[in-house]
A protein has these predicted regions:
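Extracytoplasmic/peripheral linker and loop segments enriched in polar/acidic and small residues
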Residues: 165, 175, 333, 345, ...
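Structural transition elements
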Residues: 354-390, 404-410
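Ligand-site clamp/hinge motif
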Residues: 218, 224, 248-295
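Gly/Pro-rich hinge or "lid" segments in bacterial periplasmic/extracellular proteins
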Residues: 186-256, 261
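N-terminal lobe/hinge region of extracytoplasmic solute-binding protein
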Residues: 46-96, 225
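Ligand/substrate-recognition segments at binding pockets and active sites
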Residues: 365, 388-457, 499
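Long beta-strand-rich cores associated with HINT superfamily self-processing modules
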Residues: 529-554
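Surface-exposed binding/hinge segments that line
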Residues: 136-209
Length: 554
């Protein structure tokens, strides 16, 4: 997954001064190993602070992924129709959807000059799959033979018993055949396996990433050596530095990027970033604050971007460890029916969002218009009846948590007003400065109330809107949802001979979510971005990633 900050899962004058100081003036340093030397001011791109340091297997939110997309490329990329196309991979083949052979193109290099070879993929995947490393992308390795031995199950979940020790430190299903070939054995047939291989968790890492103890080094997390069109200009100190600086990697096999340097500017407030964009102190935003969308088209003209997005916005609940209202399926349904999605999308978002009626986005196969039915239909009377009959009035105030660095205040306040008016509930919006804090608290089972969440596809498949978020062992399962029938439907979809043949099974899993509502689908995203007069040829892909390789100075 890709959980989002704004459409990306993202304060005062002092912060503004820091942001402007970080992006204004100064020269990008010369860098060894094929990096460009520039005295021009870098192009400045808005992001939120990444949740973790910059390691592919531990990056599961879009701000970190935005940076990694500049630094790395994967086995596959995706065309305009969201179909996988080979990038580093020469071929990805299987006779049975279980045993896969991946052959690589020759000539790709890491930024330190070492070759991108089969071992670099196997080493990276093994490290991400090792449960001891607690990487966010661990779950995506779960279909490979040997994963279970590296990730033994805790017998009592959150109880006092501990999981047994792992019996392996590498995936037995990965085998290096030669420098440019490796094989992958899956536990079960999965026709969608090639489609997922463009996700960040599957990027390769060089030998330089690992220290003598076999661990990814702290230095690598601050200054990752990638294989993409840009390379790090200097190390990034998370929690300290207000920007992440990259420069062009001149020896990139696919040619040179048009830009010589990019600074990813870290903001804790979209409104501040937007003011910087208006003032010319920022060059690209891939998502604008809600309050700016209505006027941005007129202000920026052909420098305004509006297009369909793969994102879905939700209200989520920790259904096992949260407050009483979070644990009640009837209360969750009542809350959903009390939300006036149409008015929120038309008014708060100036018509640039669409009311959500499914967990699966309309941009991928498997979406069904109206699938959510009554639960996503605005009906204040029925919502109030259900809320009262389920004892909602006795369950205390409903907290609505959201990240203040993502431009969510307006729509969360609108939802809160819906619930106060239609349910008679006491509702407390709970802004948190950084989205990473919410994710960390959810992961630690500390968050008790409802929370704002969003998802942008990692790869174009209906499965990606279901399994990575709601499967019991998924690293992005912040709700705690656990349903055996759901898992069986997912398994059936994965095992189908083709993605198309698996859609019905994925939809059956979707139906279970629509009944239980661990999350409430609220709206489907559109991309609403803009860029300054300093740049041109700015495009944003369906994954909410800026296509930096082709951006040019104006």
């Amino acid at each position: 997954m890709r959980v989002t900050k704004g459409a990306k899962f993202i304060a005062g004058s002092a912060l503004l001064m820091l942001a402007v100081a970080a992006c204004g003036g100064g020269e990008s340093p010369s860098t060894p190993g094929g990096g460009g030397t520039t005295t021009a001011q870098p192009v400045r791109v808005e992001i939120a602070e990444p949740q973790h340091e910059l390691v592919p297997g531990n990056t599961a939110e879009t701000s970190g992924a935005e940076v990694l997309n500049a630094l790395f490329i994967g086995l596959v990329n995706y065309d305009a129709d969201k179909k996988p196309v080979n990038q580093i991979a020469e071929t990805i083949t299987s006779d049975d959807q279980v045993n896969w052979t991946i052959k690589l193109k020759d000539g790709y290099k890491f930024h330190d000059g070492t070759p991108v070879d089969a071992q670099s993929f196997v080493d990276s995947w093994n490290y991400t799959a090792n449960g001891a490393n607690a990487y966010e992308g661990n779950y995506f390795m779960g279909s490979i033979v040997g994963y279970d031995e590296m990730n033994p199950v805790d017998p009592d979940g959150e109880g006092p018993q501990e999981a047994p020790a792992a019996t392996a430190t590498s995936l037995s299903g990965l085998k290096v055949v030669d420098n440019l070939t490796f094989t992958v054995a899956l536990k079960n047939p999965f026709s969608g396996f090639p489609t997922m291989l463009g996700y960040t968790a599957f990027y390769p890492m060089p030998k330089a990433a690992f220290g003598p103890d076999g661990k990814v080094t702290e230095a690598y997390g601050k200054s990752p050596v990638g294989n993409g069109p840009f390379k790090m200009a200097k190390p990034w100190e998370r929690g300290k530095d207000q920007s992440i600086s990259v420069v062009r990697y001149d020896e990139f096999k696919e040619g040179q990027a048009k830009l010589d340097a990019v600074d990813f500017m870290i903001y804790t407030d979209l409104a501040t970033a937007y003011r910087d964009l208006q003032a010319g102190n920022l060059d690209i935003m891939d998502q604008l604050p809600a309050e700016a969308i209505g006027s941005a088209k007129a202000e920026f003209g052909d420098r305004y971007i509006e297009q369909p997005s793969s994102g879905v916005g939700y209200i989520g609940f920790p259904i096992k460890t949260g407050a009483d209202y979070a644990k009640s399926a009837d209360i969750r349904k009542a809350i959903s029916m009390a939300i006036d999605r149409k008015t929120i999308t038309e008014t708060v978002f100036s018509g640039t969002r669409v009311p959500a009626d499914d967990f699966i986005s309309p941009v991928v196969s498997g979406y069904r218009q109206g699938a959510c039915g009554e639960a996503c239909t605005y009906d204040p009377v029925k919502a109030k009846e259900l809320f009262d009959s389920a004892g909602g009035a006795k369950m205390g105030a409903i907290e609505l948590g959201y990240n203040a660095d993502g431009g969510h205040k307006e729509w969360i306040e609108a939802v809160a007003n819906n619930l106060r008016t239609n349910l008679g509930a006491e509702v407390t919006p709970k802004p948190v400065e950084k989205f990473a804090t919410i994710l960390d608290d959810l992961g630690a089972k500390k968050w008790k109330g409802a929370f704002r969440m969003a998802w942008i596809m990692d790869y174009p498949s209906p499965e990606n809107y279901l399994k990575p978020i709601f499967a019991a062992k998924a690293s992005s399962n912040y709700s705690g949802f656990d349903d055996k029938a759901f898992e069986e439907h997912i398994k059936a979809g994965d095992s189908a001979k083709t993605l198309e043949e698996g859609i019905a099974a994925y939809q059956a899993a979707d139906d279970i979510l629509l009944k239980e509502l661990p999350y409430i689908p609220v709206y489907f995203y559109q991309t609403n971005g803009a860029f300054s007069q300093n740049v041109k040829n700015v495009k944003i892909d369906p994954f909410e990633r800026i296509e930096l390789f082709n951006v040019e100075r104006a």
